[in-house]
Amino acid sequence: MAPNKPSVKGKSSSKGDSGKSKPLSSASKVSKKHAKRPPPKEVKSKARTESSLLKKTKKREYTEEELGLPKLNMITPVGVVKPKGKKKGKVFVDDQEGMMTILAMVNAEQEGHIESKLQKARQLEEIREAKRKEAEARHAEKKNKLEEAKQSIRQKRKRKSSGNEDSKSDASTSKSSSKSKEKRKSVSFA
């Protein structure tokens, strides 16, 4: 078996063991002594200056609510009051005339919008009506041209077939009917 190392650290009973351990420990001590360390940086002084700078720049900031400043770019009517510390809402003063003037202004504005919408709708309806009439007129013109063309073709036929064409057309119709009878094929399904 392999020799067991003593479990107790520190001074050993055998002379050889103590000799071996001393040079190792002395060598490690020497290497630590010879290793040069950089000089320590002054971190503490910087930390003190940073904290002092932070303390200097840190000031209390007040909110708008604490200062009680009015909000900018807001138009508040005369009768509207916003009580502090309560729910947001509009509380009208008991001034009936002021309230009625505000209501009248709003209603007039809304009626103006409605009237303008109605006017636009009427104008659009008139435009649609005019377009529809134009389309009907074009359609009627096309029909008239078609009817005139049909009449002219009929008159040309009548002029050509004053006497000879009538007898030939009767004969041709009878021949075509007999041919159609002959050409018919019967199909039986099995």
UniProtKB/Swiss-Prot annotation:
It comes from the Eukaryota. Residues 1-69, 129-190 are annotated as: Disordered. Residues 1-29 have a biased composition (Low complexity). Keywords: Coiled coil, mRNA transport, Nucleus, Ribosome biogenesis, Transport. One of its GO terms (biological process) is intracellular mRNA localization. Residues 39-49, 129-151 have a biased composition (Basic and acidic residues). Residues 181-190 have a biased composition (Basic residues). Disulfide bonds: none annotated. Residues 109-165 form a coiled coil. GO terms for molecular function: mRNA binding. It is found in: Nucleus, Nucleolus. InterPro entries: Loc1 (IPR037650). Its main location: nucleus. GO terms for cellular component: nucleolus; preribosome, large subunit precursor. Required for efficient assembly and nuclear export of the 60S ribosomal subunit. PANTHER family: 60S RIBOSOMAL SUBUNIT ASSEMBLY/EXPORT PROTEIN LOC1, 60S RIBOSOMAL SUBUNIT ASSEMBLY_EXPORT PROTEIN LOC1. Belongs to the LOC1 family. Component of the 66S pre-ribosomal particle. This is 60S ribosomal subunit assembly/export protein loc1.
